[in-house]
């Protein structure tokens, strides 16, 4: 009995194993059959699509063939129509030429008479217009003479105004103000017009312009003018006396001392003063030198420099350069301070980035350890289960989890030779 039971058990196990093998093979054959059926169905569908495309292309070929035949017929018909129309147009032009020749001969005869009549009328009309324009020109010339007389009076009035001391002074001040405005200097910051001050002797002074230069320097401009500078007549003696008087009054005013005293009271420290005597035109400077060749030397000896518009523009250009350079130096200090703040901010950001780098390194290290443990302990069991015939369905299970490592490297700092770079 025990031997029979063992034999029966063995037979059942063998039978069960055969059934499992048969089941697995049947399952495999079914899957292969299903796969082949799907491929066969896909091939049939592709064949149907290809047949449909073939039919479509054949239809298009037939349509294109019909269109080509139709176009060939149209070309032949158009050539026939063009030949017929050319022949008919040629005949029509021939007939039209005959008619036009006859009409032109008749029109030429009529035009001869009409032209003669029109010429007579045009000559009469032109004569009337000429007489009318001549009368109008005579009237305009009379009115122009009146305007010239009025303009002459206005010019004389302007000349008299300029020849007066007040008019000449205003002209010089206006010229000075226009030059200062066009020089690029900033009003009320780089220069002040008509600066009024009172001396210790209660004497009021008003230089026409004061320009603030860097390093405690001032440029004082006082415009001087005379009617003899504008007058076209030769008045060298009077001009010399007038300009010497202007120089004397300008020296007696002692702008340098009084302006320094006045401005230093306003918590502004100025050390040096340059005084300019401004003349309204370069011709005025030449007249002064011609009237008194020693005038410039005398003025320079008093630390006063006579200049015209060109000389003033040169000095203002130099002054603008100094002011701009000083402003750039002041801004340079501000830039240095801002760069210092920027470097401090960069240091703070570097500390934070260093901490972030450490955190990233720890995260990647921990992930790598997790992936190694997962691949070793979990994925090996998953593979064993899949070998037993249990699939994951539509989900694809990766063979292993990818592992990552962070490589720490120090960046090389490129040092730049500042001196060679500036060279």
UniProtKB/Swiss-Prot annotation:
GO biological process, one term: DNA recombination
Alphabetical list of InterPro entries matching this protein: DNA_recombination_RmuC (IPR003798)
Superkingdom, taxonomy of origin: Bacteria
Record keywords: Coiled coil, DNA recombination
Coiled-coil region list: 30-81
Function: Involved in DNA recombination.
Family: Belongs to the RmuC family.
Name of the protein in question: DNA recombination protein RmuC homolog
Gene giving rise to this polypeptide: rmuC
